């Protein structure tokens, strides 16, 4: 009887161990984090894969919570931040120590639901929060939200922050728009009202200051932001800014076009009939000469100067997602969710030269360069 009981106990503990292993987030470590490292999110595995771009092998997998969509690395390459999207249900940003290859406590965004697009600029994690219709930033030191700005647009999805953090662009999918935010010390449209008496302060406006002092009233501490909303094509989602900062190209998934925006003029200067329905992401090469678009099973390559298609590669069966360019400009990496791999494209020959198994349903990617 004791033998049977012991066998039953061992059998049950063995089954329990197998079940727990099956449901627990995958975490493994095979080698130190390379420099640079390609970071790839697996939505299915709820994990961040750390990839060695030299060997195209995954050196570690780190759990990052439910529904991870986008990832960005800190400037020093030591930390990764991952948006837990949930189509508006979630409100966290997961954090990974890339050197230790371990998860850290999540950042809770409170009522700012649906975090998606990410950028890391000047020590801050900038994010979109779709369900809250805002963009915001988190101080990477305190890991607390330190700035929020409403967009008034539907599904503010992706974000680009200029290196000086004085200008921000977002795509707003369901509004079919792009928003340009510009930091200013003097908000547009604020003019000093006429004074009605010695103690008149205006209706809900800042105090006009000493009598006889000209100019507009002072803005809020730290300045303000001017917002320009630019109509583009339907389903505006993936976009990028040229390396010189002059243009933004926006992939419009619903009508398959690409909108070219003059950022200084704040207007669309060209609409390319790209035949890119379902376009998910768009990325420029580091030298700015070409733009790559992921659209379903295809990657479409454009010459930026001529705005003409150069080549169309059919790679997967569908679900083309995140795109990243190797920092030296030699390769592009494109995630194909339905196929479960990341395609590696030689940017000189425009041919697929490898594939990375980064986990099920790969999508968001980023580079981590250790400093």
Question: In which residue ranges do the predicted regions lie?
Answer:
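N-terminal secretory signal peptides that target proteins for export/translocation
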Residues: 1-6
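Predominantly soluble domains enriched in secretory-pathway, periplasmic, or organellar proteins
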Residues: 10-14, 18-371
